[in-house]
Amino acid sequence: MKRLYLFICILLLIITGVFAWEFTPAFDLNANLTYPYTSVDKELQKKLSGAVDTAGSFMINTDLLPQLWFIPTVTLNYASTAQPLNIDDERFLFSQWLDAYISYGVNYEINPGIWELRLRGFYRKDFSQQTQDEVVGKGLYDYADMGLYFENINIFSMGDMGNETAIGFKYTDRRFPNYKTLVSDPGVQELIGSNTNPNTYTKEKDSLSYNIYASDNIKWGSSNWFTNLEFSYEYTPYTEQKVIYLDGVLTDERRVDKYSRLTLEIPYYADDYSGISFGYGLTVKLTNQNYYDQLGTTEPEDDKYIKNYYNYLGHTLNFTIHYGIPDLLFKGQTTTAVIALMVEAVNYNTRYAKDREGFYKPDLQKDNNYTVSLDLKHSIFEWWEVSAKAAFTDYHSNMQYESFGLYNYSYFTAGLGSSVSF
């Protein structure tokens, strides 16, 4: 698959080199200095940390097919700021994070400004360092994505209402090269015996993903109101992870996750600097994976079996205000203040919460999180922007047992940033 992808990229480069007649480059660079504070891990707090995001792309048009555009894209994101990341519905703090993404594909304008087709192949490499002494590139949750997506774009009007619709399909092959289950370790196998637990595979997090999605962006005449609606359905089979049944027995059946997501955004733009936005998101996750908890003992009488352990229903609400403040930094120039609030509620269908000692409560697990942020942005020139940002996030859950993940803590960051775009 990698060789085929590389061959296609080289072939397209040769074609564009011979037939190119129009070249449109684009480049973005963002840099931030950040001070993080977390309520749970003093080791990951730093007096000053940084983040750099870069993105570069260009469009090449050919005289062979003037409506066909070749578009390679490269992005690189790095952060040394302590930050929470979700891993399989559990949250961990990471000290460093690096993400590299490459895509190459084409846009074909069947009817310019009305109908367009897009095809992309992509490759992503993600490195995440949990502790300071962990070697970068050897992280347990490092992963690589390879895949492609196809989109059909239509732009049309209905009365005074402008629409842009998209229908697409995305395929992703995700691999965790460093991940190993505990019982795959030879020392552990010798201790427990090879016949007492068949869970000796090492690639239990590797998966494939098939995603179909549709969206509609609507402009309501000259009112400056917009509506963005999107629905997606994702089918994710795991390549090796086996389904757990009663008594902890693993079968040959593989885990399959199914996600249904619906998002609605309603923005209003008063002018170039001011506006408001409302948003709602609904996520339904269904899985055939179960959970068998031995509660740290060898007595089977107190074991707990939970069917469909990862099923949940999630709701997200967003509210954002953009407000232009004239003459705040320089006379005759406007600074934009962005105040944002995000509230999230996750209700698990069958998973029970635990107390601090690890014993199950009679209540199902519920997570309630929120983030509030203030962002000041000022354009020095058309291509150069500076910013200052502060954000506070609070995670709260009735799951109090945190030996395998974080559920209750707060996270604060404050920082200064600068970005250039060409």
Whereabouts are the PLM-identified features?
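Short glycine/proline- and aromatic-enriched beta-strand/turn motifs that initiate or cap beta-hairpins
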Residues: 20-61, 77
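Membrane-embedded beta-strand positions of outer-membrane beta-barrel proteins
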Residues: 25-31, 72-76, 117-121, 165-169, ...
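Outer-membrane beta-barrel "beta-signal"
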Residues: 408-422
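Transmembrane beta-strands of outer-membrane beta-barrel pores
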Residues: 29-39, 76-84, 121-129, 144, ...
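Repeated loop/turn-to-beta-strand initiation elements of outer-membrane beta-barrel proteins
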Residues: 66-72, 110-118, 156-165, 220-229, ...
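Residues on the lipid-exposed face of transmembrane beta-strands in outer-membrane beta-barrel proteins
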Residues: 54-64, 98-110, 148-154, 212-218, ...
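Detector for outer-membrane/organellar transmembrane beta-barrel domains
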Residues: 215-241, 257-353
